[in-house]
């Protein structure tokens, strides 16, 4: 490709509305342009990267035995009503109508469509297992699209769906998809972790997220410093302290704390160690309970894990925090003064709180706290559960090492769905015993457009993108200095361009009438891994300057050796 016949569209300045580095660099490198909130046009450089990602995904899915299909973006509402998700999915589901006022949706996912296909196409257990995938546009009406293509409303996704007659068969395909995803992200040169995850609104019995480690990530990824254990923070178990609860050394006293409405204020004003404080959070109780609210207690320096809390049998789903009005109606005190002593509703405490002694908590009287509280002396030990987020340094749940926490960007997610959708849509086949058998399902997604942004978040420097070789838009950039004035430079540039292309190497020849500084800046910005610079001064010595983008190292290579050198670097 020649720049004179290409839309480079690079920008010198960073657009003001671009928050994260991938959004900034994708705009500056001429990869995308914003059309409307959460909607982007992909320009030639972006499309080239996108296709590289797609191709790797497609190759590994095919290698794993999955079969490619293509389903409509527009889906009839009847399928969503049949599955129950028409009401459940919420405002992210974009509902539309055709000219006959028949309701449809723009597909955010395709479980209903593929299950409908299978229930009409398959009839016998002998046809299974089967795993279908597509690479298709999705639309989710995000309330606040942000971070460019990282959280856009329209995006490209690889979604796969497998069908089975047994849990054992599902597990085999699930394991194959786990391995395929690991190969996909390894081939792309990404630093990632596969972590145990909550199944969320998709449902099912088991799931793993594939997280690209990056400081800008929205998820906390937890992993052991010595073993293979890894989990999303929502699912990571906080192990109970091994040490027995220390004996009481203080009497419980009622203390006036009129200006201490938060743990931070309490700690600062009364010089308390934060690990000797407890915070109390009130949430709605499950429907039918004899109490309207449930009190959840975690240590002052810990955070409530809302996913764990929602799974408590006493707690309403979705988890809903009580308003101040609701709290006062039950406890007769405000949110800053709550604690376990004389709490008139059910209490659940975290494992760490159960191991505390001589601690401070609200007195359930406005502007007052109890100091020196001890379990079973001042208040009976309530129900104990794991309801907090783990923190760095906690013991690993597998008993090996301690936990580290890094930020991650979710680029893939695999689920064991079970029979959730097949039961709702009555997808069954004749089993081996001759009876009708509901199908067991798995689903497996990769955010193709998000992978591009995540790769940038992991691979950039002050000059621009530093693509992993496997997904770079071009493999080699040829920069001929003063090409339009030097016949020797022009002739060599054309010769090398032809020879490299003949070797199957993707080359961008910068044949613009631009200053060298502009040419260098653009090639570094768009992140082409290998650059060769042709100039009269080096050619006097039969030399060509070669530069590797990732480490910035330069070297002079003889003109006659440059093609073989590049082929070796790229193809090994």
UniProtKB/Swiss-Prot annotation:
Keywords: Aminoacyl-tRNA synthetase, ATP-binding, Cytoplasm, Ligase, Nucleotide-binding, Protein biosynthesis. Its EC number is 6.1.1.15. It is found in: Cytoplasm. One of its GO terms (cellular component) is cytosol. InterPro entries: aa-tRNA-synt_IIb (IPR002314), aa-tRNA-synth_II (IPR006195), aa-tRNA-synth_II/BPL/LPL (IPR045864), Anticodon-bd (IPR004154), Anticodon-bd_dom_sf (IPR036621), Pro-tRNA-ligase_IIa (IPR002316), Pro-tRNA-synth_IIa_bac-type (IPR004500), Pro-tRNA-Synthase_IIa_type1 (IPR023717). Disulfide bonds: none annotated. It catalyses: tRNA(Pro) + L-proline + ATP = L-prolyl-tRNA(Pro) + AMP + diphosphate. Pfam families: HGTP_anticodon, tRNA-synt_2b, tRNA_edit. PROSITE patterns: AA_TRNA_LIGASE_II. Consists of three domains: the N-terminal catalytic domain, the editing domain and the C-terminal anticodon-binding domain. This is Proline--tRNA ligase. It comes from Escherichia fergusonii (strain ATCC 35469 / DSM 13698 / CCUG 18766 / IAM 14443 / JCM 21226 / LMG 7866 / NBRC 102419 / NCTC 12128 / CDC 0568-73). The gene is proS.
